[in-house]
């Protein structure tokens, strides 16, 4: 074959959420990219729940968008219900979530792929990697076609040696209706990469025509509707639909308990030994682990504007089909419901992410990158974030430029990757805001301020996004400066109005920025004062200004903590360090340090159970060692 057809700079294997972001990122950066997928029609497929975002996950989507990724715009064009979670709480934990029309979402992703310059899409499953020593040089497909590139991004999802379980029956599958990648899984195992097995699951799908919606609680979306992308507009959203809420009950739980002898997880005859996602457990796990509860909430979510399928979020199961029917029909509003697709569990291979560099390149094979569920994560958003980072770094490597990854204080993507490569995972990893030490700095609303300039530098951010970002930043900086320079004196004509806004006496001269720091003073309220002048009308800028004012003290303190950590972050832990000589370290801490072998104090600080006090002791001892070696020298 012509080398122009077979030779590329970057090859991406897999067309799920990780693979599509990886391929788009590499191509946007100007390198010739090939996306190999089993099925072009399932590019960007939502294999499980029809939703994007949520606590921690929405933050990842905003960061992907700030770096020029596709997920946020795709959900803005396909979302059929939008909500802001934790709206009454602080800005650090507020998160956007949207129900998606599966078909529209897939179309939005495919449109971007097919119109992306430098990107070639080819439908063929990959069965082998082409290696030269410890370097990857290409991939071989099922029909024997060989494609060459010195950078390969592998995003295999749940397809590596995938096995589907329904009751005590099981069969090979990458997901329902798709074949697994068994030969590729076997080849990867031959490379002696550290491999394990994980499990995930999905609920049965229900026919909306057989559901009594009036018997359930309606859950509408937010008004006004939020948007995901910094370039998004509410006008992009299609028609909106409500979700509904119902509950399991004691009868539901009895059906589940009575069928555990047919469960692939609980029965002695069952074949599932792998670990499932802790924060998205099956309904049988919920009933057994929380036996004191007599009900569990179930969200009935539409799958699309033109589909009759409903997704009952909260009853993922691998119990036999007959039991699944009993479970569904035992709930209020679903007494006559008909199942259109059974729920199932799926086991698959993943590789210990501690074998990765922070760029997501494998340590063992140069030029080979892993992204998504192959690294032990769960969720579309986690996969997409890894895909973008891996695709970007594969392109940087092809361009012979320095690779990049965000720190924990720069992005949730940095938290995600650092957790994986430092701690590994024994269960499917899901992002939460609680995983980030500096979540006040890593808000949804400021992801563009943290990452868009980096994306622009690397060629990920186009002109339109950059101009919009620059305009926003200029407006915000000018308004902040104006508020900090505009003073109001206790004898000013509008002092009484200021006091009414603050609900406090104006005892000394203050700036408008100082007034805005008060919890009960909003920007819009300040703007009613005659002395205020022309107010900013962009609500995203107003939100930023209010957060800057009201959280200024907290942000400053968190920045101090970050600066301290950075100073110690890269302090190397000597290989010959004798932990037994460090008085004050507990035996548990010593054992964890021996098990994980962190290279730096920063890595040590993120090991579960390693306290700040232990890190301080390590730092003191390392400094003493350095002084001793210098004096001896």
Curated annotation (Swiss-Prot):
Keyword Ribonucleoprotein on entry: no
GO molecular function: flavin adenine dinucleotide binding
InterPro entries found in the cross-reference section: FAD/NAD-bd_sf (IPR036188), GIDA_C_N (IPR049312), MnmG (IPR004416), MnmG-rel (IPR002218), MnmG-rel_CS (IPR020595), MnmG_C (IPR026904), MnmG_C_subdom (IPR047001), MnmG_C_subdom_sf (IPR044920)
Spans through the membrane: none
Protein's UniProt keywords contain NAD: yes
GO CC terms, sorted: cytosol
Domain of life: Bacteria
Binding-site residues, NAD(+): 276-290
Cell compartment(s), UniProt: Cytoplasm
Cofactor(s) annotated in UniProt: FAD
GO annotation (BP), single: tRNA methylation
Keyword entries, A-Z: Cytoplasm, FAD, Flavoprotein, NAD, tRNA processing
Residues engaged in binding FAD: 14-19, 126, 181, 373
Family statement: Belongs to the MnmG family.
Record text on subunit structure and interactions: Homodimer. Heterotetramer of two MnmE and two MnmG subunits.
Its job: NAD-binding protein involved in the addition of a carboxymethylaminomethyl (cmnm) group at the wobble position (U34) of certain tRNAs, forming tRNA-cmnm(5)s(2)U34.
HAMAP family listed in its UniProt record: MnmG_GidA
Protein name per its UniProtKB record: tRNA uridine 5-carboxymethylaminomethyl modification enzyme MnmG
Species per Swiss-Prot/TrEMBL record: Hydrogenovibrio crunogenus (strain DSM 25203 / XCL-2)
């Amino acid at each position: 074959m012509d080398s122009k057809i077979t030779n590329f700079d970057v090859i991406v294997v897999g067309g799920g959420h990780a693979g599509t972001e990886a391929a788009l990122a590499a191509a946007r950066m100007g390198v010739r990219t090939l996306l190999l997928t089993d099925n072009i029609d399932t590019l960007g497929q939502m294999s499980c729940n029809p939703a994007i975002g949520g606590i921690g996950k929405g933050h990842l989507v905003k960061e992907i968008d700030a770096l020029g990724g596709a997920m946020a715009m795709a959900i803005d064009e396909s979302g059929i219900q939008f909500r802001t979670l934790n709206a009454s709480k602080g800005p650090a934990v507020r998160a956007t979530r949207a129900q998606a029309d599966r078909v529209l979402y897939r179309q939005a992703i495919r449109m971007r792929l097919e119109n992306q310059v430098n990107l070639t899409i080819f439908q063929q499953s990959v069965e082998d990697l082409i290696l030269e020593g410890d370097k990857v040089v290409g991939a071989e497909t099922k029909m024997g076609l060989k494609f060459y590139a010195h950078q390969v991004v592998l995003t295999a999802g749940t397809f590596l040696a995938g096995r589907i379980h329904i009751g005590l029956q099981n069969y090979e599958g990458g997901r329902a209706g798709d074949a697994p990648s068994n030969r590729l899984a076997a080849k990867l195992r031959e490379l002696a990469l550290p491999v394990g097995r994980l499990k995930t699951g999905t609920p049965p799908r229900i026919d909306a025509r057989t559901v009594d919606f009036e018997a359930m609680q309606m859950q509408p979306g937010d008004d006004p509707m939020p948007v995901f992308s910094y370039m998004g507009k509410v006008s992009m959203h299609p028609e909106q639909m409500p979700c509904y809420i119902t509950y399991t009950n004691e009868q539901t739980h009895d059906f589940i308990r009575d069928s555990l002898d047919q469960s692939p997880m609980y029965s002695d005859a069952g074949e599932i030994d792998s670990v499932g996602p802790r924060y998205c457990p099956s309904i049988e796990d919920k009933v057994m682990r929380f036996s004191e509860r007599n009900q569990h909430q179930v969200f009935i979510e539409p799958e699309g504007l033109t589909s009759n399928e409903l997704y009952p979020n909260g009853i993922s199961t691998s119990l036999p089909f007959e039991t699944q029917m009993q479970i569904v029909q035992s709930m209020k509003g679903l007494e006559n419901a008909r199942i259109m697709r059974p729920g199932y569990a799926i086991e698959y291979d993943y590789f210990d992410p501690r074998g990765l560099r922070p760029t997501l390149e494998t340590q063992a094979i140069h030029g080979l990158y892993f992204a998504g569920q192959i690294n032990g994560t769960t969720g579309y958003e986690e996969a997409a974030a890894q895909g973008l980072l891996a695709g970007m770094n594969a392109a940087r490597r092809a361009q012979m430029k320095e690779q990049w990854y965000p720190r924990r204080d720069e992005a949730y993507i940095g938290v995600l990757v650092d957790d994986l490569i430092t701690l590994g995972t024994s269960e499917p990893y899901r992002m939460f805001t609680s995983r980030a030490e500096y979540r006040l700095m890593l808000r949804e609303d400021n992801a563009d301020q943290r990452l868009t300039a980096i994306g622009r530098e690397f060629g990920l951010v186009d002109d339109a996004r950059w101009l919009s970002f620059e305009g926003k930043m200029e407006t915000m900086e000018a308004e902040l400066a104006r508020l900090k320079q505009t003073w109001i004196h206790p004898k000013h004509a509008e002092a009484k109005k200021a006091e009414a806004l603050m609900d406090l006496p104006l005892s000394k001269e203050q700036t408008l920025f100082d007034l805005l720091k008060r919890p009960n003073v909003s920007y819009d309220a300040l703007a009613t004062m005659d002395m205020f002048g022309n107010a900013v009308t962009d609500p995203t800028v107003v939100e930023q200004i209010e957060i800057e004012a009201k959280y200024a003290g907290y942000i400053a303190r968190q920045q101090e903590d970050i600066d301290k950590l950075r100073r110690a972050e890269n302090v190397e832990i000597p290989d010959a360090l004798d932990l037994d000589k460090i008085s004050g370290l507990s035996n548990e801490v010593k054992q964890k340090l021996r098990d994980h072998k962190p290279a730096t104090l920063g890595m040590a600080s993120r090991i579960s159970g390693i306290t700040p006090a232990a890190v301080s002791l390590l730092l003191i001892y390392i400094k003493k060692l350095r002084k001793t070696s210098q004096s001896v020298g």
